[in-house]
Swiss-Prot record:
One of its GO terms (biological process) is hair follicle morphogenesis. Residues 247-385 are annotated as: Coil 2. The gene is Krt27. Keywords: Coiled coil, Cytoplasm, Intermediate filament, Keratin. Residues 1-73 are annotated as: Head. This is Keratin, type I cytoskeletal 27.
């Protein structure tokens, strides 16, 4: 807002106001003849935040005549002063009402468009914070529940893999045992065949022994029959060999020989069977120990593979959990950074608004001080005017009074309405013409 005072004719006051769309201006000029000598005072204009402009009263020069005494009718002069004071007080009251109206409008605007309103530039989401916290808690619990379910699925999958590996290992072990059993069956078949061969040989030898015994008995019977015949041969020879004894001896020799052969065959069979049995026992023990060792090694390998798979699965699960945790932390960090940025922006806006309110408060304090100073000056002028009137009343004589020529004071107040871009929308001129006994008020509208 700019305030300009210019003089035209006797004294003209003009006030130019610029605001968001409303302007208020008031000016007053008063010229009181006969008080002081060339004394003048001017009450300047001021600006209020929110589009309020006040142009204070411009009190014109109180001029006195060359004798320094009041001339004319003192009652009319005091009445003019009272009228001007009443007009000034009315202007002050009107400005106070306008100021209160603008303050109410500003308050309504802040309530409607300020922070905390639904249409404001800075929304207040404080009522949504409990809902957001509840939803965040539900999301965290659901995330933890999902992580627990995923962990249980991983554990179940690992358990299934372990059981599958155990089944495969047991199946391989079963197949290996079946193969060993089949091998042992082949060995058993070979041993059975060998035993059968030995039994056949034993039967053959037994049959041969029986056949030899039978032949021996037949020969013995034949010899006995031949010896027991009715042939009587008498010879005068030397006594011969006793055939019975000879046959008995031969039978004894053959029996001893057969027994010896049987013993030798049995000893040979026992020897061969013992070595074979020992070899079979050694081979069976070595096979059993090797099979046991192989089984232990397979079990150890299976256990190590299961542990390796479980460790790999645990590593994968921990890596997934770490990745998910890092992602969650990154998301939370980004949200916190966004909240920090929003809070910093809000803090900057609050500081800016605080600075603006501080400046407005300082301007209002300056306006208040200026108005108080103007009121004090006006009161001091009124007090001086009353003293001058009393002095003039005591010293005045009918012969020394001079007739004062009528004087005219013209006050022009220019009120302009501007848009936010500074363009003049409309302009009005208030003209106040005052005489010693008559006041004419005119209003002229100037098109923009």
């Amino acid at each position: 807002m700019s305030v300009r005072f210019s003089s035209a004719s006797r004294r003209l006051g003009s006030v130019r106001l610029s605001s968001a769309g409303a302007a208020l201006g008031a000016g007053n000029a008063c010229g009181v003849p006969g008080i002081g000598s060339g004394f003048s005072c001017a009450f300047g204009g001021s600006s209020l935040a929110g589009g309020l402009g006040m142009g204070g009263a411009s009190c014109g020069a109180f001029t006195a005549n060359e004798h320094g005494l009041l001339s004319g009718n003192e009652k009319v002069t005091m009445q003019n002063l009272n009228d001007r004071l009443a007009s000034y007080l009315e202007n002050v009251q009107a400005l106070e009402e306008a100021n209160a109206d603008l303050e109410q409008k500003i308050k309504d605007w802040y309530e409607k468009f300020g922070p905390g309103s639904c249409r404001g530039l800075d929304h207040d989401y404080s009522r949504y914070f409990p809902i957001i916290d509840d939803l965040r808690t539900q999301i965290i619990s659901a995330t933890a529940h999902n992580a627990n379910i995923i962990l249980q699925n991983d554990n179940a999958r690992l358990t299934a893999d372990d059981f599958r590996m155990k089944y495969e290992n047991e199946l391989a072990l079963h197949q290996s045992v079946d193969a060993d059993i089949n091998g042992l069956r082949r060995v058993l078949d070979e041993l059975t065949l060998c035993r059968t061969d030995l039994e056949v040989q034993l039967e053959t030898l037994s049959e041969e022994l029986a056949y030899l015994k039978k032949n021996h008995e037949e020969e013995m019977q034949a010899l006995q029959c031949a010896a027991g015949g009715n042939v009587n041969v008498e010879m005068n020879a030397a006594p011969g060999v006793d055939l019975t004894v000879l046959l008995n001896n031969m039978r004894a020799e053959y029996e001893a020989l057969a027994e010896q052969n049987r013993r030798d065959a049995e000893a040979w069979f026992q020897e061969k069977s013992a070595s074979l049995q020992q070899q079979i026992s050694d081979d069976a023990g070595a096979t059993t120990s090797a099979r046991n060792e192989l089984t232990e090694m397979k079990r150890t390998l299976q256990t190590l593979e299961i542990e390796l798979q479980s460790l790999l699965a645990m590593k994968h699960s921990l890596e997934c959990s770490l990745t998910e945790t890092e992602g969650n932390y990154c998301t939370q960090l980004a949200q916190i950074q966004a909240q920090i940025s929003a809070l910093e922006e809000q803090l900057h806006q609050v500081r800016t608004e605080t600075e603006g309110q501080k400046l407005e408060y300082e301007q209002l304090l300056n306006v208040k001080a200026h108005l108080e100073k103007e009121i004090e000056t006006y009161c001091r002028l009124i007090d001086g005017d009353e003293g001058s009137c009393v002095k003039a009343k005591g010293q005045g004589r009918p012969g020394n009074q001079t007739k004062d020529s009528p004087k005219t004071a013209i006050v022009k107040t220019v009120v302009e309405e501007l848009d936010p871009r500074g363009k003049v929308l409309s302009s009005r001129v208030h003209t106040l013409e005052e005489k010693s006994t008559k006041v004419n008020k005119t209003e002229q509208r100037i098109p923009s």
